[in-house]
Amino acid sequence: MIIYLHGFDSSSPGNHEKVMQLKFIDEDVRFVNYSTLHPRHDMQFLLNEVHKLVSESKDPAPLICGVGLGGYWSERIGFLCGIKQAIFNPNLFPYENMTGKIDRPEEYKDIETKCVENFREKNKGKCLVFLSKEDGILDSQRSAALLSPFYEIVWDDVETHKFKKISHHLQRIKAFKQR
C-alpha cells in the first residue's frame, strides 16, 4: 500500500496523475485529502487516517508519499506511524513561506518544537528524498543540507516544485519500499 498526501494545492490535477503513476508499482494507492489550512487539525487528522489505513492493510511494508506540503507531513506522519516515506520537494519551512496562504502558519513551528526530539536521527534511512535542482519555489539546497545527514537524496534535473512526473523514479521507490 502507498498512501499519497497532496501538497498545498489539493485540487491540482497533478495529484490524480501522481496517484495513477504510483499504481504502476503498487495497485493499492490511497489518496488522503486534508485541509492544508489548519496545521494542528491537519496533523491530528492525518495521524488518525494514516494509522487506520496502516492498521487495516495487509501490506507488510506500506509507504507514505507526498509532494511539497504533503512531503512535510509524510516525513512526520510516516515516522510516527512507523512506515517508510518517499518525499518530493518537501516544504520543510511552512512557517516561513505559508504566511498569507493559511490561517496560522506559526502552528508549524509549534508542531516542530513539540515533535519527538531528534526524530530524523530516529528515522534515519527510512525516508527517500527527491529534490528538483530547479524547484522554483523552495530552496532545494537548504532542504538537502537539512536532510542529507539522515536520508538518501535523489536529485532531479527536469521537474519543478510540483514534481508533475514521478514515473522515472518509480523503480527506485519500489526498491526502497521493499527493502
Curated annotation (Swiss-Prot):
Q: Which residues form a coiled coil?
A: none
Domain of life from the UniProt record: Bacteria
- One Pfam family recorded for the sequence: UPF0227
InterPro entries named in the record: AB_hydrolase_fold, UPF0227, UPF0227/Esterase_YqiA
The family database entries (PANTHER family) matched by this protein are listed as: ESTERASE YQIA-RELATED (PTHR35602), UPF0227 PROTEIN YCFP (PTHR35602:SF2)
The UniProt similarity line reads: Belongs to the UPF0227 family.
Its name, as the record gives it, is: UPF0227 protein PM0825
Provenance organism:
Pasteurella multocida (strain Pm70)
